[in-house]
């Protein structure tokens, strides 16, 4: 493995715990600690912990911060509060998704954008390029933050025991600042990437290991990127670089809820997204279940039963929960019909599949 890979503050901790390390977006990250299936099931049925400190954090501050983030992002940021985060997209002029991200309003003139690890530099440069007309400061503060995700049906009860705040009623994308956890001051966000209840914890980078080790004392399973991928795929959650790209719009990528082109404010890509909202996008993302043995991998062709190509697989795996072979695919809009049978070209075979809902959590 290349010695040029970036490491999170927990790298040596993974190694000491016997994790299998892989390259991901320029980082050395654990793909698994025990087994992907064991870690997956821990999150689906109990509780698991992920290090996501490789994610990027970009801070926007200044007098025009609120107008600037709205100009950059496809969702309506005007109603953000200092306790409610928002999932949104950073789009180009054609409506293509440069990145999908979560924005936190930390104060009236202070916003934190949490972006995908592989896109941090690209996003930062894009934001810098568009800030000229706004009175704002933009900083890449990724090296100041550690980020952990504690996920699973038992996560809320555990966090409630450990923090000095009541998190019982916290809803999706609500967050609290200034929360004390193992002596560290953190941002606690009710969010995740698994389809389960849970929290994402933002801390000072120097506190990351203390919090990680502290949580693992409570019968919490450490989990790697392998389980993170199978969990998000079962939940029908897209991955940027596969299911979302700069040539895929929110309406094509299945995140239409993150696009609000009818608001008064202007934003980059608005005209294209307004047209797609009103008239439909040329393609759409669907869930697939293979009806024959095989795994649908990224880039595999999707065909109708006559062998005509109508799209391609963007992500696929075998579901540890159901044992089924599941996928997300991008197909022509007019070819969509729930339950319809299709073919997927898996190596030299054409395997039958059917269109199903994207969220395929089965437990």
Swiss-Prot record:
GO BP terms, alphabetized: glycine decarboxylation via glycine cleavage system
Keywords carried by this UniProt record: Aminotransferase, Transferase
Key word Disulfide bond present: no
Gene Ontology molecular function, alphabetical: aminomethyltransferase activity; transaminase activity
GO cellular component, one term: glycine cleavage complex
Reactions catalysed according to its record: N(6)-[(R)-S(8)-aminomethyldihydrolipoyl]-L-lysyl-[protein] + (6S)-5,6,7,8-tetrahydrofolate = N(6)-[(R)-dihydrolipoyl]-L-lysyl-[protein] + (6R)-5,10-methylene-5,6,7,8-tetrahydrofolate + NH4(+)
Name of one Pfam family that matches: GCV_T
InterPro entries (UniProt xref): GCS_T, GCS_T_bac, GCST_C, GCV_T_N, GcvT/YgfZ/DmdA, GcvT/YgfZ_C, TrmE/GcvT_dom1
Record's keyword annotation contains Transferase: yes
Assigned EC number: 2.1.2.10
Family: Belongs to the GcvT family.
Protein purpose: The glycine cleavage system catalyzes the degradation of glycine.
Quaternary context: The glycine cleavage system is composed of four proteins: P, T, L and H.
Protein known as: Aminomethyltransferase
Source lineage: Bacteria, Bacillati, Bacillota, Bacilli, Bacillales
């Amino acid at each position: 493995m290349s010695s040029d890979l970036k490491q999170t503050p927990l790298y040596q901790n993974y190694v000491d715990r016997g994790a299998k390390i892989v390259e991901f977006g320029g980082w050395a990250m654990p793909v698994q600690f025990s087994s992907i299936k064991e870690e997956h099931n821990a999150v689906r049925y109990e509780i698991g912990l992920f290090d996501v400190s490789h994610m990027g954090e970009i801070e926007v501050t200044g007098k025009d911060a609120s107008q600037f983030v709205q100009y950059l992002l496809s969702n309506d940021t005007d109603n953000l509060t200092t306790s409610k985060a928002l999932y949104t997209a950073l789009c180009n002029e054609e409506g293509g998704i440069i990145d999908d991200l979560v924005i936190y309003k930390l104060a009236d003139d202070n916003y934190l954008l949490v972006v995908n690890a592989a896109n941090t530099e690209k996003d930062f440069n894009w934001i810098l390029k568009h800030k000229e007309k706004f009175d704002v400061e933009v900083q890449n503060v990724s090296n100041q933050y550690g980020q952990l995700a504690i996920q699973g049906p038992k996560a809320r009860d555990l966090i409630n025991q450990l923090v000095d705040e009541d998190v019982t009623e916290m809803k999706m994308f609500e967050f609290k600042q200034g929360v004390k956890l193992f002596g560290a001051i953190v941002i606690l966000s009710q969010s995740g990437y698994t389809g389960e209840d849970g929290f994402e914890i933002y801390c000072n980078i120097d506190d990351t290991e203390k919090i990680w080790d502290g949580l693992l004392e409570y019968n919490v399973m450490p989990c790697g990127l392998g389980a993170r991928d199978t969990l998000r795929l079962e939940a029908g959650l897209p991955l940027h670089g596969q299911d979302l790209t700069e040539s895929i719009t929110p309406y094509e990528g299945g995140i239409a809820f993150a696009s609000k082109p009818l608001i008064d404010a202007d934003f980059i890509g608005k005209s294209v997204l307004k047209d797609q909202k009103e008239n439909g996008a040329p393609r759409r993302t669907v869930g697939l279940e293979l009806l024959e043995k095989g795994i649908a991998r990224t880039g595999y062709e999707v065909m109708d039963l006559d062998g005509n190509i109508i799209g391609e697989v963007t992500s696929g795996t075998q579901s540890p929960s159901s044992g089924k072979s599941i996928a997300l695919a991008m197909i022509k809009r007019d070819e969509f019909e729930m339950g319809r049978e299709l073919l997927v070209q898996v190596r030299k075979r054409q395997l039958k599949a059917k269109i199903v809902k994207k969220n395929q959590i089965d437990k």
